[in-house]
């Protein structure tokens, strides 16, 4: 689901709709970090994280990034922390009671592509060597949920296929494990 949310966020942002695209991007980043926590608990400690345990992180990207970094050292600070804060702000502003008199939406698709590609690539690489083959399945082909029949129907309807959507204006395209 994280990959589908990421592709949906790209589509919305490329279509000039940051009001929906940025919260969807936030959800994609949240889901991939929570997925890491679930996979890490299962592989490293043979624990099943419950929905309740995951909910304690709420939708707070900064808290999630902090938790992920305590488990596997990554570079989620600096400019990316600012981007995570922008995504968090956009997620919080989904409802009118959170709107300010002047809303600013900073939609930087290049940053979204960079951080999402980085998370997908590096989370599994930070598992211990003996656990990496199992963790690598986590960062598999980004469009694997779409079989040939689904892609054909998407294209017949005149829509962008997932691979075309992933490739459109994406400087990080080569970092995704996709055909």
Residue map of PLM features:
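Charged alpha-helical initiation segments
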Residues: 1-25, 35-44
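Long, charged low-complexity segments
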Residues: 41-179
């Amino acid at each position: 689901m994280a990959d589908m949310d990421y592709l949906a966020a790209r589509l919305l942002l490329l279509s000039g709709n940051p009001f929906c695209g940025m919260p969807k991007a936030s959800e994609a980043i949240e889901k991939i970090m929570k997925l890491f926590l679930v996979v890490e608990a299962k592989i490293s400690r043979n624990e099943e994280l419950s929905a309740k345990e995951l909910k304690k992180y709420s939708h707070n990207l900064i808290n999630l990034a902090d938790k992920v970094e305590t488990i596997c050292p990554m570079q989620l600070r600096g400019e990316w922390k600012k981007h995570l804060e922008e995504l968090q702000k956009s997620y919080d502003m989904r409802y009118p009671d959170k709107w300010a008199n002047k809303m600013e939406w900073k939609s930087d698709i290049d940053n979204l592509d960079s951080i999402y590609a980085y998370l997908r690539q590096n989370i599994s690489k930070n598992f211990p060597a003996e656990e990496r083959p199992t963790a690598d399945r986590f960062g598999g082909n980004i469009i694997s949920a779409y079989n040939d029949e689904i892609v054909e129907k998407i294209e017949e309807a005149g829509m962008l296929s997932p691979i075309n959507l992933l490739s459109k204006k994406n400087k990080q395209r080569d970092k995704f494990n996709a055909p």
